[in-house]
Amino acid sequence: KEIASKDQVELVDGANAFHRGGLLRLGAVLTTTSAPLRTSPVKRGDWVLRRVLGPAIPPPPADAGSIPADEKLFGGLTLREKLAAHQRNATCAGCHSRIDPLGFPLEKYDAIGRSRDQYPDGKPIDDSGVLASQKRLSGVEGLLDYLKSEEKQVVRTLAQKLLGYALGRTILLSDQPLIDRLADAGGNASFSKLAAEIVAS
């Protein structure tokens, strides 16, 4: 076909061959979760934690410091090494141990979402993350497998986000029974089913 159908969404064959497919590999998500001149496993991991898994984490302390926006200012260290040095600060380590392992699996996508195998200086990219439970996530596929294993929490977060959007307000305690019902649908909860349940509630 030369022109895409206007009546339906069609699955694109072979998206995985180009390291594409799904929300986490979407260029817009990868770009907005990057620093201006480099990737940010912290921003990407925070996005996955807050938007996909759902738990809230506190903002960083005022004295947390920051990592330069340009990799050229890392003094020969890799981004992972720079973040490891940052985590030595005990006040930072607690949250970063939850955030960073979810962001590192997306490192093989640059600051504007292009697939890559090495950093601009030629160093190979380690796209693994190790969770606090010592579970290792190997690349984006490992991250996706982990999210599938956390399906109930992912569905609950999606239900909360959809309901908040539909109502145009923050979720209240009185909304929890509906969220529980939506989350209990588990693997049967498609996006359209969640939306229909919210509309009918």
Regions found by a protein language model. Name each.
Residues A166-T170:
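Core structural elements
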Residues K1-G164, Q176-F191, A196-S201:
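Active-site substrate-binding loop specific to GH73 endo-beta-N-acetylglucosaminidase modules
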